[in-house]
Amino acid sequence: ADRGQTLKAFQEAEAYNGPSIIFAYAPCIAHGIDMSKTQTEQKRAVEAGYFPLYRYNPANEQPFTWDAKEPKESYQDFIKSEGRYKSLMKTNPSEAEALYEKAEKDAATRMSVFKAVGELLK
């Protein structure tokens, strides 16, 4: 979604003297998108708050770095555009809507927790 953030994450992981892990959003065929558009889908995931960008490096003076901006795309519009979520809507629309609402609330809570942790680690 952000090449600069990705490069920083890899550089920090490589330079850290210890185990490192990088979490990445990687669209697949089950998402129902044109696989030549994965970078666009990654950007949409970030812009909807589905996959916030952050880094944690215990070697840094400020270990937690929040790289995400406030979501500017609708979370539900994003998930409803992916095949794996569309299939749920086809099989059980009322349950799907309830789960979409819950997923959106969970994502907002997760974003708040990440921000709070980031503030604590400054």
Which residue ranges define each predicted feature?
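Segments forming glycine/polar-rich beta-alpha architectures that bind adenosine-containing cofactors
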Residues: 117, 121
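Hydrophobic, well-ordered beta-alpha structural blocks that scaffold small-molecule cofactor pockets
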Residues: 107-110
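Acidic carboxylate-rich catalytic motifs and surrounding loops in phosphoryl-/glycosyl-chemistry enzymes
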Residues: 1-3
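Glycine/aspartate-rich loop-and-adjacent alpha/beta segment that forms the canonical ThDP
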Residues: 6-95, 102, 112-116
